[in-house]
Regions:
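Active-site core segments that coordinate phosphate-bearing ligands/cofactors
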Residues: 1-154, 159-217
Length: 217
């Protein structure tokens, strides 16, 4: 399977048996025609990105040169040092409505009690987990109710641009091993390029699946 995670996110898992009907799950196919269960979520990193931009404005206010890749790297990595329970902090990252959880409109919300452990590491960890929270709900249906087994899940998209962080957050959220390639941050454009390469470079009669296994992965 694979997970694309950026401003929105989705998981696509190739399945080998017929599933029950779930409002949270869409059935699609691979380019080769294999059945795929898809969990699509409207909200992923948009709310987190808004907070990162706030930190960028503060850095600009101090007169410090801004490098967005460095800001993301520092903030994402500090999240790994946070408490496992995020210090009790909660984030609801719904910039827009979320059909998976039945919300028609978005109202992003950050919540803490007076005694929660409110620091930067826990703050960032909270928002990273919130980014994949709805995705976890859909994947729990696939893994726990439908008993889907996955060989591997490949992550791609902006969440994985900072090496190791998004990968670990997602692995913990959906309790599955996540592999990430060097091209993870390229997103859909890289997949389109692969399809183009297949059309040009496949051996006579070679299926797309065989081409990907033998020449790409």
């Amino acid at each position: 399977g694979n997970v694309s995670a950026g401003t929105s996110d989705f998981a696509m898992v190739v399945v080998d048996h017929k599933l029950n009907v779930h409002e949270e799950i869409d059935m699609v196919t691979t380019p080769a025609g294999k059945p795929v269960a898809m969990v699509h979520c409207n909200n992923c990193t948009s709310d987190l990105n808004a907070w990162v931009n706030l930190f960028k404005e503060y850095q600009e206010l101090l007169g410090i040169p801004v490098n967005m890749d460095e800001i993301y790297s520092k903030l994402y990595n500090i999240a790994l040092t946070g408490d496992t329970d995020c210090g009790g902090l909660l984030s609801y990252n719904y910039i827009s409505g979320e059909p998976v959880t039945g919300f028609a409109d978005g109202r992003p919300l950050f919540v803490r009690s007076a005694n929660d452990k409110f620091n930067l590491a826990n703050f960032m960890r909270t928002h990273l987990y919130a980014s994949v929270g709805v995705l976890k709900i859909g994947n729990d249906i696939l893994f726990n109710e439908e008993k889907i087994k996955v060989d591997r899940i490949t992550g791609h998209g902006g969440l994985f641009r900072t090496k190791g962080v998004g990968q670990r957050i997602l692995a913990a959220a959906i309790n599955s091993p996540i592999s990430v390639m060097e091209t993870a941050g390229e997103g859909g454009a890289w997949g389109i390029a692969l399809l183009g390469s297949y059309l040009v470079n496949n051996k006579k009669g070679q299926s797309l699946a065989d081409f990907l296994d033998e020449s790409v992965f």
